[in-house]
């Protein structure tokens, strides 16, 4: 079953979202202190600065990841769409888990591997290039999986959850953050992730709305746009244009969006 066959499922995301876009983000852009300074300004005390996470990850989100995943020392955690690895590495350190990060951006994977030693011993983390719906991991090899703000990038969202159902051991949990939207004008809006999750073979255990998700994200976009000259000078036009595009395209739609955190489980 694909997206188009599930009630509430949607068409693929914008075609211009590519691995190359994320290579710029995880490479040139992420190496600038500008981005993390602006994130601190937007999120304030809720921002876990050490992670340098691209997603809208807060201390609240990290706490829910810990409680939802229920993973312990020596177990295998998968960080799906890991980017530069901040979320997965923090969780591996906090829980004692063995981490595998998967991302479609080679630059993100390289940066995650380079940062790993800041969080855990070298043997506790590995990172591979792979797709949201085709990780390359062995069946039933993971005790838990997490994905921060990325499942919506998949061309076939159902396939993401089917891949998690394949990779997770029976009873293991997959916790992810995303947004839901009631905007009838947006062909890429997901009004409800539950039917997509279940079509992929997982069970929804809980859905929570992320506190201040809309306000904090708008604050970050406003900060980017207010400092665009500094961003152009520090990052270059191409990377700055990526940020402007996101802020100007997504910002006006936030009134229709709700940030959500789902805890799901393999049967």
What are these model-derived regions, one by one?
Residues 1-46:
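N-terminal, positively charged/glycine-rich alpha-helical extensions of SAM-dependent methyltransferases
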């Amino acid at each position: 079953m694909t997206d188009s066959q599930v009630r509430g499922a949607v068409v693929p995301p914008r075609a211009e979202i590519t691995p190359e876009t994320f290579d710029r983000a995880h490479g040139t852009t992420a190496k600038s202190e500008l981005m993390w300074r602006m994130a601190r300004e937007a999120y304030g005390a809720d921002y876990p600065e050490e992670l340098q996470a691209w997603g809208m990850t807060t201390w609240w989100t990290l706490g829910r990841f810990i409680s939802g995943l229920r993973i312990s020392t020596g177990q295998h955690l998968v960080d799906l769409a890991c980017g530069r690895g901040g979320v997965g590495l923090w969780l591996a350190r906090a829980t004692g888990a063995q981490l595998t990060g998967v991302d479609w951006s080679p630059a993100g994977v390289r940066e995650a591997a380079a940062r790993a030693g800041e969080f855990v011993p070298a043997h506790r983390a590995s990172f591979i290039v792979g797709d949201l719906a085709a990780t390359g991991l062995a069946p039933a090899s993971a005790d838990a999986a997490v994905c921060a703000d990325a499942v919506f990038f998949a061309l076939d969202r159902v396939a993401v959850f089917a891949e998690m159902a394949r990779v997770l051991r029976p009873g293991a949990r997959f916790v992810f953050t995303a947004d839901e939207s009631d905007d009838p004008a947006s062909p890429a809006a997901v009004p409800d992730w539950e039917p997509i999750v279940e079509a992929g073979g997982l069970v929804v255990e809980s859905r929570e709305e992320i506190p201040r998700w809309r306000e904090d994200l708008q604050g970050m976009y406003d900060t980017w746009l207010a400092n665009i000259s500094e961003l152009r000078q520090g990052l270059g036009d191409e990377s700055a244009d990526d940020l402007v595009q996101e802020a100007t395209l997504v910002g006006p739609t936030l009134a229709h969006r709700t940030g959500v955190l789902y805890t799901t489980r393999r049967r």
